[in-house]
Amino acid sequence: MKFRKINCAVMFLLLSISIQSNANTLPADLSWENNNNAKPWASPLATKGGKFTDFILTFPPTLRTVGPDSNSSFRSYINANQLGLTDFHPNTLEIIPQIATEWAYGQDGKTVFYKLDPSARWSDGNPVTADDFLFTLDFMRSKHINAPWYNNHYTNEITSVKKFGDHTISITGRVAKPKEELHYYYGLVPTPKHFYKKIDKNWVKKYNWKIIPNTGPYQISKIKKGKRITFERKSDWWAADRPLNKNRFNVDKVILKVIRDTNIAYKHFEKGELDSYALVLPEFWHNKAKGKLYDNGYLEKFTFYNNSPRSSSGWFLNTDNSILKEKPVRIALAHALNFDKVIKTVLRGDYERLQAFHTGYGEFSNKNISARKFDLKAANKILDEAGWQQRGGDGVRISNGQRLSLNLVYGRKEHSDRWSILKQDALKAGIEINLRLQDSSSHYKTIMQKQHQIASLGWSTGFRPAFWQHFHSENAHKPQTNNITNLDNKNIDKDIEAYRAETDSNKRVKLANALAQQIHDSAVFIPSFKVPYTRGAHWRWLKFPDAPGTKTSSTLYSPFGDGGIFWVDSKTKIETKAARKNSTKYSSVNKTFDQYRENTSD
């Protein structure tokens, strides 16, 4: 055997690099926590097996979770199977372990130390190590991923990730924060360093349809483009025996079919081709979810009241538009929209009016803010004073030859009736609203390219109110950012930056409330509705714990994330299909669960 000679200087350099990579020393005074006694929310009666079939309205434009076109609704399925260091208990909001088994806090108030589970594995069998978390920082800072928000956050908000051996790390943020916020804002998910060979200018295109290794209970196993995506449960998942994971993630397969029309999807559900169907929309709950399938007990209905931050749902006004850049027009438009009429008629009184962009965040929500009420007299006065006195033969106002005509883009056909009512009343104030229904993919692209005038949508919620991504001028006037109103206000910028940097909880609350007032005053967002519950129907072979959801459940039928608590009873499935053929009846089921119902409205 031949041995290659190594220069002594090279040997010293290699040794030096090895020592430096593990040279960090843990502080001696750390107090480690684990919260292993957190209460499970699954049922010991749950059984494994079977498949769960659901639908999505559009096929995802990419499997990437960062970069162009990645911010689609499908991303939530992928992210839910990528564990972070810790998570929040869905009922108590206390910190619970995931990849980290223990954590401790640095004296600086902005550093958290984590001990990683040595048994953690990627779906391809490779171990999850400290290097994967260090790589996350490099990955998210790379310009090649074409993701400005991530570039900014991981560059300016997370200042360092340090390694103390293969299974211990620390994360330090830019400023000190309360302990629970350190985990949320500075927490990381690992990125498989062994999988990404090179992050270069071709990364976006190269990884558009790559199935990335993950750490969660399921992995994508089959893709039929434009038709369906299948996830399979890992039979040897490394975290399956964790106390909080037992009796969860029970079905063997999760199949997501692409069905581009909700009415057609409901027909698939009634045929037994889908296992559940969300019935939040009043039209479906009151008009469709009835008949023999329900009367005979084959389909069961659940209403579950939750208590969590509410989606920022409403109309977003693009201030780069020549008409909507005028603040009086924006305020007048808000007064010309009769949302209460929509709630009473189309929505059957089921929904409530959302009052502000951030609601349900406790003291971080400004409860003194109310959405502008429908008031045609006020709308007309404002527009007259703003120079829009003249009207055409059709009643639409005109100023300097320009009609007060605006396009509303929206992505759900089921919303057409509600917007038609608003359109009719707005015309009484001389405002023409043209309804532009788009498929989900086109709707998303239009908004991300800032090509809309008015966009109807709802943003997902977070742990605390988020202002920077939605309202800071850094994200205005350019595509692929979440400031879709293009709000550009230096005073608001200043307070957003102060809010992000503030370490005192009381001061942060005051800043959050002040920012909420400024955003309301800017009139770039018109709140629409909030829904204080989730509800749906399912075939009786889907079984649930006594509480079919958690305090923060947005749906009862989530197979991933903090869900996965239902299971398929194969015996009941066979029995139900036979009963349907021979007309055997069961007791009808229409249950309401209100243990987490809000005592007072926001």
Predicted regions located by residue number:
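Alpha-helical secondary-structure segments
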Residues: 53, 129-136, 168-172, 178, ...
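Gly/Pro-rich hinge or "lid" segments in bacterial periplasmic/extracellular proteins
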Residues: 82, 89-94, 186-248, 253, ...
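Extracellular/periplasmic solute-recognition and catalytic clefts
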Residues: 143, 147, 221-232, 257-321, ...
